[in-house]
Amino acid sequence: MLLPIPDVLSPAQLSQLRAQLDVADWADGRITAGHQSAQAKDNAQLPEDSAVAREAGALVLEALARSSTFFSAVLPRRIYPPLFNRYSGGQSFGYHVDNAVRYDRSRGGAEAVRTDVSATLFLSDPDSYDGGELVIEDTYGTQSVKLPAGHLVIYPGTSLHRVMPVTRGARVACFFWAQSMLRDAAQRRLLFELDVSIRRLTQDTPGHPSLIQLTGVYHNLLRQWADV
């Protein structure tokens, strides 16, 4: 399921993030790439252990925690600490599939995170740069994504995708992965659609007795499928 989620960041949060990132020290983005994807990757990235990356990542996680749409669509069990990249001067990232497992060393040790869901949070105004579209190959064909600053897109971690060359300005974004309680993308889509329908029915016909039954169906399916 490819899903844009608008306004994950407020204007104040976006301004704070950009102020931090504008003065940050960027490094070669290939530091987090696997062997194959490193050959296709050309961008700049904040080192994961930098103070700016940790502070900015914490802000993003706080924003995600307030997004009911993100939670409903992803049903996250673990979220890999958010990372930040920048493309400019013709930089791009060729077609690749994200590593199946990432190792979170932010708390000491190395906690495995299965990358069920990939996410990109756009931090640059789309009018401030040319190119930089996130191109995703999914079940319904090729999707090109270039969203307003503060908007998020999520898509299955199994997807073949690329970032087109940025020929003017700079494209700054946050990216991360989530391990869902539901490994299967079709199950995630089904529960998301059911949750959205329940919410709409609650608004349109509050107190309808069928809502209790539908909510029970949702939770019983989650109980049957969830890996927690």
Swiss-Prot record:
Keywords: Dioxygenase, Iron, Metal-binding, Oxidoreductase, Vitamin C. Fe cation binds at H96, D98, H161. SMART domains: P4Hc. GO terms for biological process: DNA damage response; intracellular iron ion homeostasis. Pfam families: 2OG-FeII_Oxy_3, PKHD_C. One of its GO terms (molecular function) is L-ascorbic acid binding. 2-oxoglutarate binds at R171. This is PKHD-type hydroxylase XAC2942. The lineage of its organism: Bacteria, Pseudomonadati, Pseudomonadota, Gammaproteobacteria, Lysobacterales.
